[in-house]
């Protein structure tokens, strides 16, 4: 489990610069489209990944002496090639914005300071805007919940749809294969709704879009483990697909409005910590919760994840949403959501 967490943490670390890159490359009025375009491609990629599990199971039969199916090796190898390949394409083909003379002088002054980056991170945490601290609570609930879902959804489908809890049986392998299709389906929903969330966020505010999306997932995950038909389980998982589109895009729309543009990089790294730490916490603690509180029942694990997403929605209500478009670096905590056009002077 710890190695899987390390793999996920490494993947998140590799993806972190892209979020800062979106904020750097796009004008304030287009950052929402940028982050939700990221949601679109994330959903499309995960859909293809989940479908590939189903394909690999039909192409690669047999298993190792340790009981690990060969299709698992094939899936990990394909994932490695795609991860390294796409990062290389982005690094080699996307020009980076050169630093200004002032920024260059500042970087050169810090060159001999080995602890400079750590000091900068520590200072950024100390000076973190209040609303971003509140967003950390939302991240705690939603990423703990998502890790619960990913770890126990196969067990839930195996128990409630295929009628098995024997993880070494052929029936359970069929359940894992079907779970890949279920996960592929919720990611189809993710890339289908991603761009519509942009319009909703501009019209209603990113805060309320994220709250509604999380509540859709709450309802879906509470219902999901109580359905025994393999085709009907695709219906409640639509809610999770909507929430996933929001989780990987909408909070970043708010976050870039909470911090100065000169510190996008360091704060995107801190937001990445807000993802990784809850997942590590879940890895270390949920085993005890699953055994002593949830009775080793994957049905309860799914419902528990749904409740946590509901708590994330409640925590989101505590946040004051920043301006919808901002063209200055100074950050304030406005009492209400408002739209500020670039170049407009507020009275």
Over which residues does each language-model region extend?
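A late C-terminal transmembrane helix in Major Facilitator Superfamily
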Residues: 262-292
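Helix-to-loop junctions at the C-terminal end of transmembrane segments
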Residues: 192-206, 290
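Intracellular juxtamembrane helix-capping segments at the cytosolic ends
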Residues: 13-26, 246-260
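C-terminal ends and interior cores of transmembrane alpha-helices
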Residues: 1, 216-228
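Intracellular loop-helix junctions on the cytosolic face of multi-pass helical membrane proteins
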Residues: 2-5, 13-14, 18-19, 25-148, ...
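Loop-to-transmembrane helix entry
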Residues: 36, 163-188, 300-303
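Loop-to-transmembrane helix entry/capping segments in MFS-fold secondary transporters
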Residues: 28-38, 176, 259-271
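Hydrophobic core of transmembrane alpha-helices in multi-pass small-molecule transporters
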Residues: 1-14, 232-246
